[in-house]
Regions:
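Short, structured beta-strand/loop micro-motifs enriched in basic residues and often containing a Trp
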Residues: 11-24
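C-terminal structural segments of small proteins and small subunits
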Residues: 43-71
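Conserved hydrophobic positions within beta-strands
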Residues: 14, 39-41
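Absolute protein N-terminus
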Residues: 1-2, 71
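Short, conserved secondary-structure segments in the cores of folded domains
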Residues: 2, 27-30, 48
Length: 71
């Protein structure tokens, strides 16, 4: 399952993040999107989704959210 498939209010645990671009991968890791971290879907809009990680909310493009795999 990917982070994009979470519904508003649902929580998941990050299994891994898969980005071909090394810079994008590092950026997500720096924001706290790391394996075994809890992620909550806060809001969905056309083209992006808001997630909460470690108490901070981030707007992530849906095309990036499909690269965040959950347990």
């Amino acid at each position: 399952m990917t982070a994009k498939k979470l519904k508003v209010g649902e929580t998941g645990i990050i299994k891994e993040i898969n980005f071909d671009n090394r810079i994008q991968y590092r950026r997500m890791m720096d924001l706290g999107f790391i394996p075994n971290e809890e992620i909550t879907c806060c809001n969905k809009t056309f083209g992006s989704t808001a997630f909460e990680v470690k108490g901070t909310k981030y707007g992530i493009r849906n095309e990036d959210a499909i690269n965040i795999l959950l347990k």
